[in-house]
């Protein structure tokens, strides 16, 4: 049986930021692809290849700023794509916007066992360590501004945003599915 994965895509156009596609399953990151100065055709091509390999059941796109429009229009009839505007409304009334919500979902997943290889995905780990939230004047969780995270890690947290996007509206990572292979891997790691 093929395990279907979920993807998150954070788009960039020019500058120093990357377009990042993060592929995950229910319990870990599977692959991260960072594209620098990629045009829509290249991003679509890379995405199609990843989908052939991982069989996405859903993909969440950063629609903030409209950089996803060409990608979305080209692929919306072929794939299960969901646009997420970071400044948009949160699905959780305790979070001030969609960006806070997706990071809150990611944090809950990590607390429940979602694994991030901190060596292989050091940039994601560093960005997560630099991300915090506060309670705003309306009593809701609010992430620190992205500029503060950039100042700490020295670049935009593109791959981390893509990973967080993959948790939008998702509850699958809240209940970690431990396959026999993962169980054996954990046993081998713990009892070396």
Describe the function of each predicted region.
Residues 1-49, 157:
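Conserved helicase/translocase motor-coupling segment
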Residues 11, 63, 159-162:
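Generic detector of well-ordered alpha-helical packing
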Residues 18, 70-72, 174:
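Short glycine-/acidic-enriched loop or helix-start segments at secondary-structure transitions
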Residues 19, 57, 160:
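Residue-level detector of short, conserved catalytic/binding motifs and their immediate flanks
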Residues 27-140, 185-192:
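Mg2+-dependent endonuclease catalytic cores in nucleic-acid-processing enzymes, primarily RNase H-like
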Residues 33-36, 134-141, 151-192:
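Acidic two-metal-ion nuclease catalytic site recognized across multiple nuclease folds
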Residues 146-148:
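Conserved helicase C-terminal RecA-like lobe
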